[in-house]
Amino acid sequence: MERNKDLTEIVDPERMISFGSSDFEQTVRFYQGSKAQITEQDFVLGSIDQLHRLGVHSSAYNDAVDTMGDLTTAICLLIIDANLMRHANPVRNPGGMLRAMTRQHKAGRLNLIGSLIGLDQKLKRKEWVGEA
């Protein structure tokens, strides 16, 4: 759980949801409701609602949660969602990617912080050139 806390301190949840699709963001906002801030629960529930749209089977999700916890799995789903929209090398098997991320986590080699920093830099470039 300590690692989960570090991730949310590094990337603001408001910024983080802008990395993914508008569907992902709208679903998290639905759970946020009238609250001033997005909570961990809003983020997790919103990501669960994306499983079918992303094509991630519930068994892959459950394995990920059992291994990484709710928040880390939700962040993985956001990263997968964001990478579905890549121009170069888009994710073609989201469920397979989640399973691979789960294996990487088990092996101590999953670098979510690096992925989030990369998505943040990509978003900043889009904002800078007026694409976002």
Predicted regions, residues:
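Electrostatic interaction modules used in gene-expression and signaling proteins
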Residues: 1-132
